[in-house]
Amino acid sequence: MRACPFLLLLLLPLLLSLGRIAAVRDAAGAGPERRQDDSVSQVQKLREEPSKVRDLQVKFIVRTTPDLDDADCYITAGQDHLLDDCNFNVSAKTFFVIHGWTMGGMYERWLDTLVSALQEREKEANVVVVNWLALAQQLYTIAVNNTRVVGKELAGLLDWLEEKKDFQLKNVHLIGYSLGAHIAGYTGNYARGIIGRITGLDPAGPMFEGADPSRRLSPDDADFVDVLHTYTRETLGISIGIQMPVGHIDIYPNGGDIQPGCGLTDILGTLALGEIGDLVICEHERSVHLFVDSLVNKDKQSFAFQCTDSGRFKKGICLSCRKNRCNSIGYNIKKMRNKRNSKMYLKTRAGMPFKVFHYQLKIHVFSYKSLGETEPSFSVTFYGTSGDSEPLPLEVSDQIGLNYTNTFLVYTEEDVGDILRIKLTWESTTQSWYNFWSQMKNYWSKPDPSSKELQIRRIRVKSGETQKKAMLAVEFWELKSTCLKMVKVEKHCSRPL
């Protein structure tokens, strides 16, 4: 039975304090021998007897089947015969999957799913699970210290493999979850050569946030480092996933904050079922499932867009693909090494396939008359060549700008194709808003301020995925209505991704 990870949220501040106290005590009262990391000495002792593979605290399991129960083939540095026994192909692409901290001493359920997806996508590749459960099932602070030990062990294995004739580090892809992401970083730091790629799946935040690059995952650890951040929201002053960018590309699905399917409504349902453990890990593990999604749904790849912060992305400002400002996420990501901003953002669905379709709306409001203090809520419905959308809410972060182009981000879960027309709707319980619209021939006529509350010239729509643009004008309007229907008046234009 798995221990409840919810305790982590309550105990992390205490664990961190205990770790600091223990470090101060050891430094003040212990001799040089006592200060030596016990885990390091234990692993070093075991390395002197490499034949006792099952006794090692770090095991490298070659997965020949998706089922963990059937996986019983280990490789270790210096034991050439184990490569043959495990059918390890030194010339093939090799994945190393590295799990994170554990409270129950067991593999997490996502590992089977990820291994199976890798084997299905790359049938000739080696898939190796780095089993460090014995060192991970410790107090969090101790497990953090053990990540360096595991990184050194894996680096030693890679150095040994690199001595083989056809083995190349550029074909190695380390995939680390939570603490496992930082283990991948240490591995790249300690290995003699340059590892091809590291993917960090929501790297752990506590004790790594703000740390020196040599003490956490960083862009220097591989030829290419990509990171998915899915749990960067602080709880009790601590973020479970690291908030800072630590790769060449750092992707923040849904702002790295609340993930669809992990919100308040889902919390209440989960509590009713008594599955609080699944609730807490929902956002943290979402990074794994997004990566799996990129492996199994090749025809439904999610796109992310470069932006300086989540706030600007939510306003729809950052849907450009110029100069490599957009990219697919997960396994199929295009390698880019940004020297400045590496942050990218996207919206997702609550489950696989996670892909959504992003749209930027630009609405120029010439004038309006507010009849109350509360802004109305807006929604828009798309009618396209492939289908229609549900009403999509427009998030108004500030007041509607007068004589100003207001930009919004909306997204659909299904592809509606090219936009043919849209319906703009607004409503409020505390005030009335009326629309004003006319054909272009009537646009320059003087409006009647006593009856016309909202004046819009036209709406521009841009698709993030296709980069197609459309301009829409009025189809018809009713003076007392809160609904405005518009049709495309110009042919769309597109810019290739």
UniProtKB/Swiss-Prot annotation:
Residues 1-23 form the signal peptide. The keyword Signal applies. Residues 357-492 form the PLAT domain. GO terms for cellular component: extracellular space. Expressed by the venom gland. Head to tail homodimer. This is Putative endothelial lipase.
